[in-house]
A protein has these predicted regions:
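Positively charged, low-complexity terminal tracts
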Residues: 1-94
């Protein structure tokens, strides 16, 4: 996965997806064949999954590389991001 969109790729997005989804929590689970990323909007005492991404382990590694590169560029431009404390829980939420 490249950080820059492929110039030959035409990507369409419908109006509903264009709005985006808010998430302040991420739950990650996996099987041998896939990773499941549940993006959650947590408003205690309830959390609502706003988006679920299912992807292969190989593609997830490319996503992580692209995120790390973009995070590094962001911090070079705007300064180091202070990490938020981990939420209390059983460790399944990241």
């Amino acid at each position: 996965m490249d950080e820059a969109p492929n110039q030959g790729l035409n990507v369409k997005i419908d109006d509903e997806e264009l709005k985006g989804r808010y998430s302040n929590l991420l739950r990650i689970t996996h099987t041998r064949e896939e990773f499941i990323l549940d993006f959650i909007n947590l408003v205690p005492p309830q959390g609502i999954v706003t988006s679920r991404i299912v992807t292969s382990p190989g593609h997830l590694k490319r996503i992580i590389r692209a995120l790390a590169a973009n995070l590094e560029r962001y911090e070079q431009l705007f300064g180091v991001i202070q990490e938020a404390p981990d939420p209390a829980g059983d460790g399944s939420v990241h």
